[in-house]
A protein has these predicted regions:
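Thiol/disulfide oxidoreductase modules built on the thioredoxin-like
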Residues: 392-432
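N-proximal helix/coil linker or "cap" segments that precede and/or mark the start of modular domains
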Residues: 260-312, 322, 372, 376
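Structural microenvironment flanking redox-active thiols in thiol-disulfide oxidoreductases
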Residues: 343-379, 392-398
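A non-transmembrane, solvent-exposed segment enriched in polar/low-complexity residues
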Residues: 19-200
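Charged, long alpha-helical assembly modules
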Residues: 174-251
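Helix-turn-helix repeat elements of alpha-solenoid scaffolds
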Residues: 146-151, 228-236, 267-271
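Bacterial Sec-dependent N-terminal signal peptides
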Residues: 1-25, 432
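Short active-site neighborhood of thiol/selenol oxidoreductases, capturing the structured segment around
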Residues: 319-348, 361-363
Length: 432
C-alpha cells in the first residue's frame, strides 16, 4: 500500500490529535444504554458504553484522530451513522422509528453537508432504478416519457451543481463506486476499487464502506472469472488483491480479514486453511483484527478448550465458567430479543431435566443490551444465566466466534468442545 493521501490534509490544529466529542440528546430515552462506535481496521469498535441522563443526554470522547463515520447504537436495534472530520459532533433526535427523520445536527458541518447527499438518494434511485424500467413501457414521443426525461435532466443538474468538501466528496465517490460495482454497469469498477485499496489512506477503513468494497470486488471477480470452481476463483481473486496491497501491510491484512469473515468456512474450508496457514507463517506485525480472525478459525474446533468466562458478579457462588463443575456443560448463546431463541427455550428446559440428573449443567450467555429485559427473560430459567449487556459487541461472543443465536456448545468436564449446534434437537438426535 502506498502511504499517501488522496485528500487534502486537515489544517493542523488541536483537533488533529483527536480528543473530539460526540454528544446527543434522545427524546423519550431517559436513563438508557447507548453504544458509541468508530471504525478501526474496517471493523466497528466500541469506544464507550454509556447511559443517557434524565433528559436523554449523553456524550463520549473519541481519543484519536478520526475522519469517518461514528455509529450510535441503541438496544432496540436502531442506530445512527454520523460523519465527522475529526471535529465535535452534536445532535438531537427522538428514539424509535423516527430516529433518522427527526435528526437535527447542532454541531458538525461535515454531517450537515452529508445530509444533502442523503436527501438526493431517493431522487437518484428513481433515476437509476425506476425510470429505466418505466421507459421500456412508453414511446419516446409519449408525454409521460418526455416528463421522465425532463426529471432526469433536473436530477442531473442538481447532482452537477452540488459541491462538497474533501471528506464528503470522498465518501460519495466510494458509495457511487460500490453501487456501480453492484449494478454491473461500470465495467471498470473493479479496477477502480483496487486503485482505492492500493492508494488510499486510512479514511478508507473509517468510511464504513471498506467491507462493502471488498465484497463488491470479490463478487465481481466470481461472476466474471474463468472456470466453475468457486473456491479456486476465490483464491485467485484473493491472491491477486493481496499481491497488489501486500499482506505485510495493514491494508492487505484488513482485506484478508474481511474475506475470512465473509467467506463461509463450512463451504470453503480449503480457502480458510490456505490463508490461515499463510498468516501463521508471517514474521511481520499482524493487526489485532487479523489475529482474532485467525485465532477464531483455529481455537473453536472439536476437542479444543473453550475460553473461560469470568462473571462480573458471582452467579450462585461461581465466579467463572470454569468454576462450574459438571460432567458436561451446555453453553447456550441466546438473547431475550431473539425470536428463534424464545422458540428454543422450552426445548432446552425439557432437555435440562435429564441433562441435570446425569450431572450436566447449562450456562446461558445472553447477548442482551437491556438489563430489565434480561432479568425478566431469565427469572424462571433454572440454570446459570449471564450477560455483559453488550449485545453483539460482547467480547465473549467474539471469543466463541458466535455469529448467530441460538448457538450451543456442548463441552466435557475439562471444558473441551464435544459438539457445536444451533438447536437442542441436534443434541437429542445425536443420542440415538
Amino acid at each position: 500500500m502506498k502511504n499517501k493521501f488522496i485528500l487534502p490534509l486537515v489544517v493542523l490544529g488541536s483537533s488533529v490529535f483527536g480528543q473530539f466529542t460526540v454528544s446527543g440528546q434522545l427524546e423519550n430515552y431517559a436513563n438508557k444504554s447507548v453504544l458509541v462506535k468508530i471504525y478501526e481496521n474496517s471493523d466497528l469498535k466500541l469506544i464507550k458504553n454509556t447511559k443517557t441522563d434524565a433528559q436523554g443526554n449523553f456524550s463520549a470522547n473519541v481519543p484519536k484522530e478520526y475522519n469517518g463515520f461514528v455509529r450510535i447504537d441503541l438496544p432496540t436495534g436502531e442506530n445512527l451513522s454520523l460523519l465527522t472530520d475529526n471535529k465535535n459532533l452534536k445532535f438531537k433526535t427522538v428514539a424509535g422509528q423516527d430516529i433518522m427523520n427527526r435528526l437535527e445536527i447542532i454541531e458538525g458541518n461535515t454531517q450537515k453537508e452529508y445530509n444533502k447527499i442523503i436527501a438526493m438518494q431517493p431522487l437518484n434511485e428513481v433515476q437509476n432504478q425506476v425510470f429505466p424500467y418505466l421507459m421500456q413501457m412508453y414511446k419516446p414521443t409519449d408525454e409521460f416519457y418526455q416528463a421522465m426525461i425532463k426529471e432526469q435532466n433536473r436530477i442531473n443538474v442538481l447532482n452537477k451543481d452540488a459541491k462538497y468538501s474533501g471528506l464528503v466528496e470522498y465518501i460519495k465517490t466510494l458509495n457511487d463506486l460500490k453501487q456501480a460495482a453492484q449494478s454491473g454497469k461500470d465495467t471498470q469498477a473493479v479496477d477502480k476499487i483496487v486503485t482505492h485499496f492500493v492508494n488510499d489512506d486510512d479514511r478508507l477503513e473509517q468510511s464504513g464502506l471498506f467491507n462493502d468494497l471488498v465484497f463488491a470486488y470479490v463478487n465481481t471477480k466470481l461472476s466474471t472469472g474463468q472456470g466453475d470452481n468457486v473456491e479456486e476463483k476465490l483464491i485467485a481473486a484473493t491472491d491477486e488483491i493481496l499481491a497488489k496491497t501486500d499482506i505485510t501491510t495493514p491494508r492487505g491484512q484488513n482485506i484478508l480479514s474481511t474475506l475470512l469473515n465473509i467467506v463461509p468456512k463450512d463451504q470453503y474450508a480449503g480457502f480458510h486453511k490456505k490463508y490461515v496457514d499463510k498468516v501463521n507463517g508471517l514474521t511481520c506485525k499482524i493487526t489485532d483484527q487479523l489475529k482474532k480472525r485467525v485465532g477464531q478459525a483455529t481455537s473453536m474446533q472439536i476437542g479444543s478448550q473453550v475460553p473461560n468466562i469470568t462473571f462480573d458478579k458471582p452467579i450462585n457462588g461461581k465466579k467463572s465458567l470454569y468454576d462450574i463443575k459438571a460432567n458436561q456443560k451446555l453453553i447456550v448463546f441466546w438473547a431475550s430479543w431473539c425470536p428463534a431463541c424464545q422458540q428454543e427455550i422450552p426445548y432446552i428446559k425439557e432437555f435440562y431435566k435429564d441433562f441435570k440428573a446425569k450431572g450436566g449443567e447449562i450456562v446461558a450467555i445472553s447477548l442482551d443490551f437491556d438489563e430489565t429485559a434480561f432479568k425478566d427473560a431469565t427469572k424462571d430459567l433454572p440454570w446459570y444465566n449471564y450477560t455483559d449487556l453488550l449485545r453483539w459487541d460482547s467480547p465473549i461472543a467474539e471469543q466463541f466466534s458466535v455469529s448467530s443465536t441460538p448457538t450451543l456448545f456442548l463441552v466435557d468436564k475439562d471444558n473441551k468442545i464435544i459438539k457445536e449446534v444451533h438447536h437442542i434437537s441436534e443434541l437429542e438426535a445425536a443420542k440415538k
